[in-house]
Protein backbone atom coordinates (compact mmCIF):
# COMPACT_ATOMS: atom_id res chain seq x y z
CA UNK A 1 0.00 0.00 0.00
CA UNK A 2 1.41 3.35 -0.98
CA UNK A 3 1.56 6.42 1.18
CA UNK A 4 -0.48 9.60 0.98
CA UNK A 5 0.77 12.75 2.63
CA UNK A 6 -0.62 16.20 3.35
CA UNK A 7 0.43 19.41 4.97
CA UNK A 8 -1.35 20.41 8.17
CA UNK A 9 -0.95 23.47 10.31
CA UNK A 10 -1.94 22.75 13.91
CA UNK A 11 -2.01 25.11 16.91
CA UNK A 12 -1.73 22.88 19.97
CA UNK A 13 -2.58 25.68 22.41
CA UNK A 14 -5.80 26.64 20.65
CA UNK A 15 -8.06 23.59 20.31
CA UNK A 16 -11.32 24.83 21.84
CA UNK A 17 -13.04 24.22 18.50
CA UNK A 18 -10.94 21.47 16.90
CA UNK A 19 -13.20 20.94 13.84
CA UNK A 20 -14.15 24.51 12.93
CA UNK A 21 -11.55 25.11 10.21
CA UNK A 22 -8.76 22.91 8.82
CA UNK A 23 -6.13 24.39 6.45
CA UNK A 24 -6.73 23.68 2.80
CA UNK A 25 -4.33 21.27 1.17
CA UNK A 26 -4.17 19.55 -2.23
CA UNK A 27 -5.69 16.37 -0.83
CA UNK A 28 -7.75 17.56 2.16
CA UNK A 29 -9.86 20.38 0.84
CA UNK A 30 -12.53 22.04 2.97
CA UNK A 31 -11.59 20.22 6.15
CA UNK A 32 -12.11 22.25 9.35
CA UNK A 33 -9.13 23.99 10.86
CA UNK A 34 -8.16 23.44 14.49
CA UNK A 35 -8.85 26.88 15.76
CA UNK A 36 -10.44 28.25 18.98
CA UNK A 37 -10.75 31.22 21.26
CA UNK A 38 -9.80 29.60 24.52
CA UNK A 39 -6.37 28.53 25.61
CA UNK A 40 -4.95 25.62 27.49
CA UNK A 41 -2.48 25.97 30.28
CA UNK A 42 1.10 25.29 29.18
CA UNK A 43 1.16 22.25 31.47
CA UNK A 44 -1.82 20.80 29.67
CA UNK A 45 -0.13 21.17 26.30
CA UNK A 46 1.62 17.80 26.66
CA UNK A 47 -1.59 15.78 27.07
CA UNK A 48 -4.99 16.23 25.50
CA UNK A 49 -8.31 15.05 26.77
CA UNK A 50 -10.42 12.63 24.85
CA UNK A 51 -12.97 14.11 22.53
CA UNK A 52 -15.88 12.54 20.69
CA UNK A 53 -16.82 12.75 17.03
CA UNK A 54 -20.60 12.63 17.33
CA UNK A 55 -23.13 14.62 15.34
CA UNK A 56 -23.04 17.30 18.01
CA UNK A 57 -20.15 19.60 18.77
CA UNK A 58 -18.14 18.75 21.91
CA UNK A 59 -18.41 21.44 24.55
CA UNK A 60 -15.31 22.14 26.58
CA UNK A 61 -15.50 22.76 30.27
CA UNK A 62 -15.99 26.35 31.32
CA UNK A 63 -12.92 26.18 33.54
CA UNK A 64 -10.74 26.70 30.47
CA UNK A 65 -12.39 30.07 29.91
CA UNK A 66 -11.15 31.37 33.26
CA UNK A 67 -7.56 31.49 32.07
CA UNK A 68 -6.79 35.08 31.13
CA UNK A 69 -3.07 34.65 30.57
CA UNK A 70 -2.57 34.23 26.83
CA UNK A 71 0.52 32.25 25.97
CA UNK A 72 2.21 32.70 22.60
CA UNK A 73 0.73 30.32 20.07
CA UNK A 74 2.94 27.46 18.99
CA UNK A 75 2.71 26.43 15.37
CA UNK A 76 3.73 22.96 14.23
CA UNK A 77 4.26 22.48 10.54
CA UNK A 78 4.88 19.02 9.29
CA UNK A 79 4.01 16.48 6.63
CA UNK A 80 1.81 13.59 7.61
CA UNK A 81 1.29 10.40 5.66
CA UNK A 82 -1.00 7.41 5.84
CA UNK A 83 0.05 3.79 5.75
CA UNK A 84 -1.60 0.59 6.92
CA UNK A 85 -0.57 -0.75 10.28
CA UNK A 86 0.95 -4.25 10.14
CA UNK A 87 -1.11 -5.47 13.08
CA UNK A 88 -3.89 -4.31 15.35
CA UNK A 89 -1.61 -3.75 18.36
CA UNK A 90 0.69 -1.17 16.81
CA UNK A 91 1.57 1.80 18.99
CA UNK A 92 0.88 5.43 18.18
CA UNK A 93 3.33 8.29 18.26
CA UNK A 94 4.46 9.32 21.70
CA UNK A 95 3.29 12.89 21.21
CA UNK A 96 -0.39 13.54 22.00
CA UNK A 97 -0.71 15.83 18.98
CA UNK A 98 0.17 12.97 16.65
CA UNK A 99 -2.25 10.74 18.56
CA UNK A 100 -5.04 13.26 18.02
CA UNK A 101 -4.36 13.58 14.30
CA UNK A 102 -4.11 9.80 13.89
CA UNK A 103 -7.43 9.46 15.63
CA UNK A 104 -9.00 11.97 13.27
CA UNK A 105 -7.70 10.33 10.10
CA UNK A 106 -7.35 6.66 11.17
CA UNK A 107 -10.04 4.10 10.52
CA UNK A 108 -10.92 0.87 12.25
CA UNK A 109 -13.77 -1.60 12.26
CA UNK A 110 -15.98 -1.60 15.29
CA UNK A 111 -17.68 -4.66 16.69
CA UNK A 112 -21.46 -5.02 16.71
CA UNK A 113 -21.50 -4.47 20.48
CA UNK A 114 -19.97 -0.99 20.45
CA UNK A 115 -21.11 1.52 23.06
CA UNK A 116 -23.80 4.13 22.13
CA UNK A 117 -22.90 7.71 21.50
CA UNK A 118 -22.34 9.85 24.56
CA UNK A 119 -24.07 13.13 25.26
CA UNK A 120 -22.34 16.53 25.21
CA UNK A 121 -22.49 16.70 28.97
CA UNK A 122 -20.76 13.35 29.39
CA UNK A 123 -18.15 14.38 26.87
CA UNK A 124 -17.44 17.60 28.73
CA UNK A 125 -17.34 15.85 32.09
CA UNK A 126 -14.99 13.19 30.81
CA UNK A 127 -12.77 15.82 29.24
CA UNK A 128 -12.71 17.82 32.47
CA UNK A 129 -11.78 14.80 34.52
CA UNK A 130 -9.14 13.84 32.01
CA UNK A 131 -7.66 17.32 31.95
CA UNK A 132 -7.45 17.43 35.72
CA UNK A 133 -5.48 14.18 35.77
CA UNK A 134 -3.50 15.05 32.59
CA UNK A 135 -2.78 11.49 31.43
CA UNK A 136 -1.62 10.95 27.82
CA UNK A 137 -4.69 9.69 26.03
CA UNK A 138 -5.29 8.49 22.54
CA UNK A 139 -8.29 8.83 20.32
CA UNK A 140 -9.46 6.64 17.48
CA UNK A 141 -12.19 6.51 14.88
CA UNK A 142 -14.03 3.27 14.25
CA UNK A 143 -16.12 2.35 11.25
CA UNK A 144 -17.83 -0.72 9.92
CA UNK A 145 -15.99 -0.93 6.60
CA UNK A 146 -12.96 0.39 4.79
CA UNK A 147 -14.09 3.23 2.57
CA UNK A 148 -12.27 6.00 0.68
CA UNK A 149 -10.40 8.21 3.09
CA UNK A 150 -10.66 11.35 1.03
CA UNK A 151 -14.03 11.18 -0.64
CA UNK A 152 -15.95 14.20 -1.86
CA UNK A 153 -15.91 16.23 1.34
CA UNK A 154 -18.47 19.09 1.46
CA UNK A 155 -18.04 22.30 3.38
CA UNK A 156 -19.19 22.39 6.96
CA UNK A 157 -21.24 25.54 7.66
CA UNK A 158 -22.83 24.23 10.86
CA UNK A 159 -21.26 23.18 14.13
CA UNK A 160 -21.91 19.47 13.68
CA UNK A 161 -20.43 18.44 10.33
CA UNK A 162 -19.98 14.94 9.02
CA UNK A 163 -16.37 14.08 8.46
CA UNK A 164 -17.08 11.02 6.35
CA UNK A 165 -20.38 11.34 4.46
CA UNK A 166 -20.17 7.86 2.89
CA UNK A 167 -20.86 6.11 6.18
CA UNK A 168 -22.28 6.94 9.58
CA UNK A 169 -19.38 7.43 11.98
CA UNK A 170 -19.52 6.00 15.45
CA UNK A 171 -18.74 8.34 18.37
CA UNK A 172 -15.92 7.92 20.82
CA UNK A 173 -16.59 5.52 23.62
CA UNK A 174 -16.52 6.65 27.22
CA UNK A 175 -13.16 7.34 28.80
CA UNK A 176 -13.78 4.68 31.41
CA UNK A 177 -14.52 2.01 28.82
CA UNK A 178 -12.67 2.85 25.59
CA UNK A 179 -9.84 5.16 26.53
CA UNK A 180 -6.62 3.30 27.11
CA UNK A 181 -3.56 5.22 28.27
CA UNK A 182 -0.43 5.20 26.13
CA UNK A 183 1.63 3.01 25.66
CA UNK A 184 0.46 0.77 24.07
CA UNK A 185 -3.07 1.54 22.80
CA UNK A 186 -5.28 -1.47 22.29
CA UNK A 187 -7.45 -1.49 19.18
CA UNK A 188 -10.51 -3.64 18.74
CA UNK A 189 -10.36 -6.44 16.21
CA UNK A 190 -10.44 -4.63 12.90
CA UNK A 191 -10.06 -5.38 9.23
CA UNK A 192 -7.81 -2.42 8.43
CA UNK A 193 -5.99 -0.12 10.81
CA UNK A 194 -4.04 2.99 9.84
CA UNK A 195 -1.67 5.26 11.66
CA UNK A 196 -0.14 8.56 10.67
CA UNK A 197 3.66 8.48 10.61
CA UNK A 198 5.76 11.49 9.82
CA UNK A 199 7.79 11.05 6.65
CA UNK A 200 10.15 13.72 5.31
CA UNK A 201 9.25 15.44 2.08
CA UNK A 202 12.42 14.49 0.24
CA UNK A 203 11.50 10.80 0.30
CA UNK A 204 8.54 11.36 -2.00
CA UNK A 205 9.33 14.26 -4.33
CA UNK A 206 6.51 13.45 -6.77
CA UNK A 207 3.89 12.06 -4.46
CA UNK A 208 2.02 15.28 -3.78
CA UNK A 209 1.49 15.97 -7.46
CA UNK A 210 0.25 12.42 -7.99
CA UNK A 211 -2.27 12.68 -5.17
CA UNK A 212 -3.55 16.04 -6.42
CA UNK A 213 -4.34 14.47 -9.80
CA UNK A 214 -6.54 11.80 -8.22
CA UNK A 215 -10.26 12.39 -8.57
CA UNK A 216 -12.53 12.79 -5.56
CA UNK A 217 -14.16 9.38 -6.00
CA UNK A 218 -10.89 7.47 -6.21
CA UNK A 219 -8.67 6.26 -3.44
CA UNK A 220 -5.25 7.83 -3.30
CA UNK A 221 -3.76 4.46 -2.44
CA UNK A 222 -5.27 2.96 -5.56
CA UNK A 223 -3.70 5.74 -7.58
CA UNK A 224 -0.32 4.98 -6.05
CA UNK A 225 -0.75 1.30 -6.87
CA UNK A 226 -1.56 2.17 -10.46
CA UNK A 227 1.49 4.36 -10.63
CA UNK A 228 3.74 1.55 -9.46
CA UNK A 229 2.22 -0.86 -11.99
CA UNK A 230 2.70 1.43 -14.98
CA UNK A 231 4.93 0.06 -17.74
CA UNK A 232 8.41 1.42 -18.18
CA UNK A 233 9.10 4.30 -20.52
CA UNK A 234 10.76 1.98 -23.04
CA UNK A 235 8.66 -1.10 -23.88
CA UNK A 236 10.27 -4.48 -23.63
CA UNK A 237 9.60 -5.19 -27.29
CA UNK A 238 11.52 -2.06 -28.27
CA UNK A 239 14.46 -3.08 -26.10
CA UNK A 240 14.52 -6.56 -27.62
CA UNK A 241 14.33 -5.15 -31.13
CA UNK A 242 17.19 -2.79 -30.41
CA UNK A 243 19.30 -5.58 -28.93
CA UNK A 244 18.64 -7.78 -31.96
CA UNK A 245 19.53 -4.99 -34.35
CA UNK A 246 22.72 -4.25 -32.42
CA UNK A 247 23.81 -7.88 -32.54
CA UNK A 248 23.17 -8.00 -36.28
CA UNK A 249 25.22 -4.88 -36.80
CA UNK A 250 28.09 -6.40 -34.85
CA UNK A 251 27.95 -9.54 -36.97
CA UNK A 252 28.04 -7.43 -40.11
CA UNK A 253 31.07 -5.55 -38.85
CA UNK A 254 32.88 -8.74 -37.93
CA UNK A 255 32.14 -10.30 -41.33
CA UNK A 256 33.14 -7.38 -43.52
CA UNK A 257 35.58 -5.45 -41.30
CA UNK A 258 34.92 -2.41 -43.44
CA UNK A 259 32.04 -0.54 -41.83
CA UNK A 260 34.03 0.52 -38.77
CA UNK A 261 37.61 1.31 -39.82
CA UNK A 262 39.24 3.42 -37.16
CA UNK A 263 42.75 3.69 -38.52
CA UNK A 264 43.70 4.17 -42.17
CA UNK A 265 45.23 1.23 -43.93
CA UNK A 266 48.98 1.00 -43.54
CA UNK A 267 50.99 0.43 -46.69
CA UNK A 268 53.42 -2.45 -46.80
CA UNK A 269 57.07 -1.69 -46.34
CA UNK A 270 58.01 -3.77 -49.37
CA UNK A 271 54.85 -4.02 -51.51
CA UNK A 272 56.52 -5.72 -54.46
CA UNK A 273 58.43 -8.29 -52.46
CA UNK A 274 57.08 -11.77 -53.13
CA UNK A 275 56.00 -13.86 -50.17
CA UNK A 276 57.60 -17.16 -49.30
CA UNK A 277 54.23 -18.93 -49.44
CA UNK A 278 52.48 -19.04 -52.84
CA UNK A 279 49.18 -17.14 -53.13
CA UNK A 280 47.06 -20.27 -53.59
CA UNK A 281 48.31 -21.50 -50.22
CA UNK A 282 47.26 -18.24 -48.55
CA UNK A 283 43.48 -18.20 -48.93
CA UNK A 284 42.76 -15.56 -46.29
CA UNK A 285 43.08 -12.13 -47.86
CA UNK A 286 42.73 -8.81 -46.06
CA UNK A 287 39.33 -7.25 -46.93
CA UNK A 288 40.67 -3.70 -46.92
CA UNK A 289 40.91 -2.43 -50.48
CA UNK A 290 44.29 -0.75 -50.14
CA UNK A 291 45.88 -3.75 -48.41
CA UNK A 292 47.01 -6.76 -50.43
CA UNK A 293 48.12 -8.97 -47.56
CA UNK A 294 47.16 -12.63 -47.61
CA UNK A 295 47.47 -15.20 -44.86
CA UNK A 296 47.46 -18.95 -44.65
CA UNK A 297 45.57 -19.07 -41.35
CA UNK A 298 42.43 -17.32 -40.17
CA UNK A 299 43.91 -16.31 -36.82
CA UNK A 300 46.68 -14.49 -38.64
CA UNK A 301 44.08 -12.57 -40.63
CA UNK A 302 42.17 -11.71 -37.45
CA UNK A 303 45.34 -10.43 -35.84
CA UNK A 304 46.15 -8.39 -38.95
CA UNK A 305 42.67 -6.85 -39.13
CA UNK A 306 43.15 -5.43 -35.64
CA UNK A 307 45.77 -3.15 -37.18
CA UNK A 308 43.10 -1.58 -39.38
CA UNK A 309 40.31 -1.47 -36.78
CA UNK A 310 42.50 -0.47 -33.84
CA UNK A 311 41.01 -3.17 -31.64
CA UNK A 312 43.06 -4.04 -28.55
CA UNK A 313 41.31 -6.82 -26.64
CA UNK A 314 44.22 -7.85 -24.42
CA UNK A 315 44.63 -5.72 -21.30
CA UNK A 316 47.38 -5.73 -18.71
CA UNK A 317 45.98 -6.33 -15.22
CA UNK A 318 48.77 -4.31 -13.64
CA UNK A 319 48.88 -1.05 -15.61
CA UNK A 320 45.58 -1.46 -17.57
CA UNK A 321 47.33 -1.03 -20.91
CA UNK A 322 45.69 -2.64 -23.94
CA UNK A 323 47.36 -4.69 -26.66
CA UNK A 324 46.20 -6.08 -29.97
CA UNK A 325 48.13 -9.34 -29.64
CA UNK A 326 48.42 -11.77 -26.79
CA UNK A 327 52.17 -12.27 -27.25
CA UNK A 328 52.67 -8.54 -26.89
CA UNK A 329 50.81 -8.68 -23.61
CA UNK A 330 52.94 -11.61 -22.46
CA UNK A 331 56.19 -9.80 -23.15
CA UNK A 332 54.79 -6.64 -21.56
CA UNK A 333 53.97 -8.44 -18.34
CA UNK A 334 57.61 -9.51 -18.13
CA UNK A 335 58.55 -5.85 -17.76
CA UNK A 336 56.54 -5.82 -14.53
CA UNK A 337 57.73 -9.19 -13.23
CA UNK A 338 61.36 -8.85 -14.35
CA UNK A 339 61.37 -12.26 -16.02
CA UNK A 340 64.07 -12.76 -18.71
CA UNK A 341 63.87 -16.29 -20.09
CA UNK A 342 66.07 -15.79 -23.20
CA UNK A 343 69.85 -15.89 -22.65
CA UNK A 344 72.67 -15.26 -25.14
CA UNK A 345 74.71 -18.36 -25.97
CA UNK A 346 77.95 -16.39 -26.29
CA UNK A 347 78.00 -13.93 -23.41
CA UNK A 348 75.14 -15.24 -21.27
CA UNK A 349 73.19 -12.00 -21.22
CA UNK A 350 69.44 -12.49 -20.58
CA UNK A 351 66.55 -10.90 -22.42
CA UNK A 352 62.79 -10.78 -21.97
CA UNK A 353 62.06 -11.18 -25.68
CA UNK A 354 63.46 -13.59 -28.22
CA UNK A 355 63.86 -10.91 -30.89
CA UNK A 356 66.01 -8.90 -28.49
CA UNK A 357 68.30 -11.89 -28.06
CA UNK A 358 68.42 -12.37 -31.83
CA UNK A 359 69.36 -8.75 -32.35
CA UNK A 360 72.03 -9.07 -29.67
CA UNK A 361 73.47 -12.19 -31.32
CA UNK A 362 74.01 -10.27 -34.55
CA UNK A 363 76.37 -7.98 -32.66
CA UNK A 364 78.59 -10.94 -31.85
CA UNK A 365 78.53 -12.06 -35.50
CA UNK A 366 79.62 -8.64 -36.70
CA UNK A 367 82.48 -8.66 -34.23
CA UNK A 368 83.64 -12.01 -35.58
CA UNK A 369 83.55 -10.70 -39.14
CA UNK A 370 85.69 -7.72 -38.20
CA UNK A 371 88.29 -9.97 -36.57
CA UNK A 372 88.40 -12.16 -39.67
CA UNK A 373 88.92 -9.13 -41.92
CA UNK A 374 91.88 -7.99 -39.83
CA UNK A 375 93.56 -11.42 -40.02
CA UNK A 376 93.25 -11.72 -43.85
CA UNK A 377 96.06 -9.20 -44.92
CA UNK A 378 98.70 -10.95 -42.78
CA UNK A 379 97.96 -14.32 -44.35
CA UNK A 380 98.20 -12.87 -47.89
CA UNK A 381 101.68 -11.23 -47.32
CA UNK A 382 103.40 -14.45 -46.28
CA UNK A 383 102.70 -16.37 -49.54
CA UNK A 384 104.24 -13.55 -51.60
CA UNK A 385 107.56 -13.80 -49.74
CA UNK A 386 107.56 -17.54 -50.13
CA UNK A 387 106.80 -17.34 -53.83
CA UNK A 388 109.55 -14.83 -54.73
CA UNK A 389 112.54 -17.25 -54.64
CA UNK A 390 110.89 -19.55 -57.13
CA UNK A 391 110.32 -16.64 -59.45
CA UNK A 392 113.97 -15.66 -59.20
CA UNK A 393 115.14 -19.13 -59.96
CA UNK A 394 112.84 -19.56 -62.94
CA UNK A 395 114.27 -16.64 -64.89
CA UNK A 396 118.05 -16.95 -64.85
CA UNK A 397 118.61 -18.31 -68.36
CA UNK A 398 116.87 -15.69 -70.51
CA UNK A 399 118.51 -12.85 -68.72
CA UNK A 400 122.09 -13.46 -69.82
CA UNK A 401 121.10 -14.17 -73.43
CA UNK A 402 119.06 -11.03 -73.92
CA UNK A 403 120.96 -8.49 -71.86
CA UNK A 404 124.55 -9.65 -71.99
CA UNK A 405 126.09 -7.21 -74.41
CA UNK A 406 124.46 -3.96 -73.28
CA UNK A 407 125.03 -4.61 -69.67
CA UNK A 408 128.68 -5.43 -70.15
CA UNK A 409 129.26 -2.17 -71.95
CA UNK A 410 127.42 -0.17 -69.35
CA UNK A 411 128.96 -1.58 -66.23
CA UNK A 412 132.54 -2.57 -66.92
CA UNK A 413 134.26 -1.11 -63.90
CA UNK A 414 132.38 -2.81 -61.02
CA UNK A 415 132.63 -6.11 -62.81
CA UNK A 416 136.41 -5.91 -63.18
CA UNK A 417 136.80 -4.98 -59.57
CA UNK A 418 134.65 -7.88 -58.40
CA UNK A 419 135.85 -10.69 -60.65
CA UNK A 420 139.48 -11.01 -61.76
CA UNK A 421 138.77 -13.14 -64.83
CA UNK A 422 138.27 -10.83 -67.79
CA UNK A 423 136.12 -13.04 -70.00
CA UNK A 424 133.74 -14.42 -67.44
CA UNK A 425 133.78 -11.39 -65.27
CA UNK A 426 132.74 -9.05 -68.07
CA UNK A 427 129.42 -10.76 -68.80
CA UNK A 428 128.03 -12.47 -65.77
CA UNK A 429 128.69 -10.00 -62.99
CA UNK A 430 126.90 -7.47 -65.17
CA UNK A 431 123.90 -9.81 -65.41
CA UNK A 432 123.96 -10.12 -61.70
CA UNK A 433 123.84 -6.41 -61.24
CA UNK A 434 121.06 -6.09 -63.80
CA UNK A 435 118.90 -8.72 -62.14
CA UNK A 436 119.40 -7.16 -58.77
CA UNK A 437 118.25 -3.82 -60.15
CA UNK A 438 115.05 -5.36 -61.47
CA UNK A 439 114.35 -7.05 -58.17
CA UNK A 440 114.85 -3.84 -56.27
CA UNK A 441 112.44 -1.94 -58.47
CA UNK A 442 109.85 -4.68 -58.19
CA UNK A 443 110.20 -5.22 -54.44
CA UNK A 444 111.35 -2.09 -52.69
CA UNK A 445 111.64 -3.82 -49.37
CA UNK A 446 115.16 -4.43 -48.15
CA UNK A 447 114.16 -7.88 -47.03
CA UNK A 448 113.29 -8.87 -50.56
CA UNK A 449 116.63 -7.70 -51.92
CA UNK A 450 118.49 -9.63 -49.29
CA UNK A 451 116.49 -12.75 -49.98
CA UNK A 452 117.21 -12.61 -53.68
CA UNK A 453 120.91 -11.88 -53.47
CA UNK A 454 122.04 -15.35 -52.55
CA UNK A 455 119.98 -17.38 -55.02
CA UNK A 456 120.93 -15.13 -57.89
CA UNK A 457 124.61 -15.33 -57.12
CA UNK A 458 124.45 -19.08 -56.92
CA UNK A 459 122.56 -19.22 -60.16
CA UNK A 460 125.12 -17.01 -61.86
CA UNK A 461 127.95 -19.19 -60.71
CA UNK A 462 126.29 -22.17 -62.32
CA UNK A 463 125.52 -20.21 -65.42
CA UNK A 464 129.14 -19.10 -65.75
CA UNK A 465 130.26 -22.66 -65.94
CA UNK A 466 127.56 -23.70 -68.37
CA UNK A 467 127.60 -20.83 -70.80
CA UNK A 468 131.24 -19.81 -70.68
CA UNK A 469 132.14 -20.79 -74.29
CA UNK A 470 129.15 -18.99 -75.75
CA UNK A 471 129.74 -15.83 -73.85
CA UNK A 472 133.34 -15.75 -74.94
CA UNK A 473 132.29 -15.93 -78.57
CA UNK A 474 129.79 -13.11 -78.14
CA UNK A 475 132.36 -10.86 -76.55
UniProtKB/Swiss-Prot annotation:
Residues 111-140 have a biased composition (Low complexity). The record marks 282, 293, 297, 303, 321, 325, 349, 353, 359 as: Interaction with DNA. Its main location: nucleus. Pfam families: DUF3432, DUF3446, zf-C2H2. It is found in: Nucleus; Cytoplasm. Residues 170-179 have a biased composition (Polar residues). GO terms for biological process: circadian regulation of gene expression; positive regulation of DNA-templated transcription; positive regulation of transcription by RNA polymerase II; regulation of DNA-templated transcription; regulation of transcription by RNA polymerase II. Keywords: Activator, Biological rhythms, Cytoplasm, DNA-binding, Metal-binding, Nucleus, Repeat, Transcription, Transcription regulation, Zinc, Zinc-finger. The keyword Nucleus applies. Residues 109-180, 264-285, 355-379 are annotated as: Disordered. A zinc finger (C2H2-type) spans 284-308, 314-336, 342-364. Residues 359-369 have a biased composition (Basic residues). The keyword ATP-binding does not apply. GO terms for cellular component: cytoplasm; nucleus. GO terms for molecular function: DNA-binding transcription factor activity; DNA-binding transcription factor activity, RNA polymerase II-specific; double-stranded methylated DNA binding; hemi-methylated DNA-binding; promoter-specific chromatin binding; RNA polymerase II cis-regulatory region sequence-specific DNA binding; sequence-specific DNA binding; zinc ion binding. Binds to DNA motifs with the sequence 5'-GCG(T/G)GGGCG-3' via its C2H2-type zinc fingers. The first, most N-terminal zinc finger binds to the 3'-GCG motif, the middle zinc finger interacts with the central TGG motif, and the C-terminal zinc finger binds to the 5'-GCG motif. Binds double-stranded target DNA, irrespective of the cytosine methylation status. Has reduced affinity for target DNA where the cytosines have been oxidized to 5-hydroxymethylcytosine. Does not bind target DNA where the cytosines have been oxidized to 5-formylcytosine or 5-carboxylcytosine. Transcriptional regulator. Recognizes and binds to the DNA sequence 5'-GCG(T/G)GGGCG-3'(EGR-site) in the promoter region of target genes. Binds double-stranded target DNA, irrespective of the cytosine methylation status. Regulates the transcription of numerous target genes, and thereby plays an important role in regulating the response to growth factors, DNA damage, and ischemia. Plays a role in the regulation of cell survival, proliferation and cell death. Mediates responses to ischemia and hypoxia; regulates the expression of proteins that are involved in inflammatory processes. Belongs to the EGR C2H2-type zinc-finger protein family. This is Early growth response protein 1-B. The lineage of its organism: Eukaryota, Metazoa, Chordata, Craniata, Vertebrata.
Amino acid sequence: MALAKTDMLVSPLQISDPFSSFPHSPTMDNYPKLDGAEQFDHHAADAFSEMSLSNEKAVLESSYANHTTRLPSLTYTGRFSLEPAPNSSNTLWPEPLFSLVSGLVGMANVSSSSAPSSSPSSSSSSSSSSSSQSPPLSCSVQSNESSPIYSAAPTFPNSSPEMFPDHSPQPFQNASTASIPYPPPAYPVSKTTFQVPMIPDYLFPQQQGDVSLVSADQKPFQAMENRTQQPSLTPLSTIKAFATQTSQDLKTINSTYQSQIIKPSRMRKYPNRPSKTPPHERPYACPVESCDRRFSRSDELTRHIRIHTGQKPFQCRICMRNFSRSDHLTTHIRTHTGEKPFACDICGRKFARSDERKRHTKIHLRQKDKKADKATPVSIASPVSAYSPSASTSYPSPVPTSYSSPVSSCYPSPVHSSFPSPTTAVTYPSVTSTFQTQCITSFPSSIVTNSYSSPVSSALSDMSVTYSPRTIEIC
